[in-house]
Structure formats: C-alpha cells, structure tokens
Design a protein with these regions (language model features):
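N-terminal targeting signals for export/organelle localization
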Residues: 1-51, 171-174, 179
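Loop/turn elements at helix/coil->beta-strand transitions in domains of secreted/extracellular proteins
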Residues: 69-72, 100-103, 126-127, 154
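Thiol/disulfide oxidoreductase modules built on the thioredoxin-like
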Residues: 119-125, 133-178
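Structural microenvironment flanking redox-active thiols in thiol-disulfide oxidoreductases
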Residues: 85-123, 133-140
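Short loop/turn microsegments at loop-to-beta-strand junctions
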Residues: 49-50, 72, 146-147
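Short active-site neighborhood of thiol/selenol oxidoreductases, capturing the structured segment around
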Residues: 64-85
Length: 179
C-alpha cells in the first residue's frame, strides 16, 4: 500500500511539474508590446538600445550608429525554438515588404551562425543573419527567453518588445513601424 501511495504521489508531482513547465513556455495571448512585467528584460520599452556592432555572414558589419535615423528590428532566436520558428515567416514578410527601409537584424542567441544559415536555406528565408560572438548583445537586452524581438526607433529608443508572450505578428509590427 505504501509503495502504491508513493507511486501516485510521484506521478502527481511529475504531472504538476510538467503543467508548470508548459505554462511558462507557452505564456499567454495577451496583446501587449510592453515588457513592464518581464523580469527577464534588461532593456525595456522606452530605454535606449545599447551600442553594438554585428557581423553579417558576408563579413559586412552593421552598427547601432549606422542605423541612426532608421527604425529597425532586432530579433534574437534559435532555430530549435518552436516560437522562433513561428516568428520567422512574419519577420521574413517584413523584410520582403520593407527591405532596407526597416532593417531586420536576426541574431542567433546560443547557436552558431552556420546552423542558423542551414535552417535559413532549408526554409527559403532570405533575411540577413548577424553574429553576436559570445552573446554579448543578447545579455545586454535580457537574461533569458527567446524569441525576443525589439523594434527600435530612429532615435535608438526601444519602442516595442515581443518575447514568447506574445510572439511578434505582422499586423502589430507594421502598426508600430508605421507610427
């Protein structure tokens, strides 16, 4: 009897832990583009984006300074992340429709750019990928959670932030960049 009781207690504990994991991974669908309740964000909406220099796959460089005067999107991702994969077509559509008018900077958080590039090729993505080296830029923005997408205005101020709650959608991004 004691063994059976212990078995059910262990199963219940496991189910409770799985439910908690699912709730933290999926988030909610609340429409918000502010990160005021995001305790993992270091740079929040209304704050200046930090200075940075990223290297493209073609050895080109992009810097925060070179983007002054433009609205741009900074996306941190991993190709193994399901929510990131959902967001890629949205960002690709923004890239296709706005091109250099609204640069989309895709930065792998914890995987090599080679793996990201392979995923891009397999899935027909053409937007650029940039290297952050040792995740320095990511950790200036946040402590964890991907996808993490920021929209930065022409003055270098973060005007919107999306993470996995909610992930970025085309209509929301377009509404923000058109303001």
């Amino acid at each position: 009897m004691k063994t059976l009781k212990s078995f059910f207690l262990n199963i219940n504990t496991l189910l409770l832990m799985l439910a908690a994991l699912c709730m933290t991974a999926c988030g909610n669908d609340e429409e918000t583009y502010s990160d005021k309740d995001d305790d993992t964000a270091i740079i929040k909406v209304g704050m200046a984006a930090p200075s940075f220099e990223l290297k493209g796959l073609d050895d080109s460089k992009v810097t925060s300074e070179s983007l002054k005067g433009k609205v741009y999107i900074l996306n941190f991702f991993d190709t193994t992340c399901p929510d990131c994969r959902k967001e890629f077509p949205v960002l690709q559509q923004i890239y296709d429709n706005y091109g250099d008018k609204v640069p989309v900077l895709n930065v792998p958080r914890s995987q090599g750019v080679e793996d990201a590039e392979a995923y891009w090729k397999e899935n027909g993505l053409t937007m650029p990928i940039y290297s952050d080296g040792a995740q320095r830029l990511y950790f200036q923005f946040a402590t964890r959670t991907i996808p993490r997408t920021y929209i930065i205005n022409a003055d270098g101020i973060v005007i919107a932030s999306f993470n996995d709650r909610p992930i970025a959608d085309y209509a929301s991004i377009e509404r923000i960049i058109r303001k």
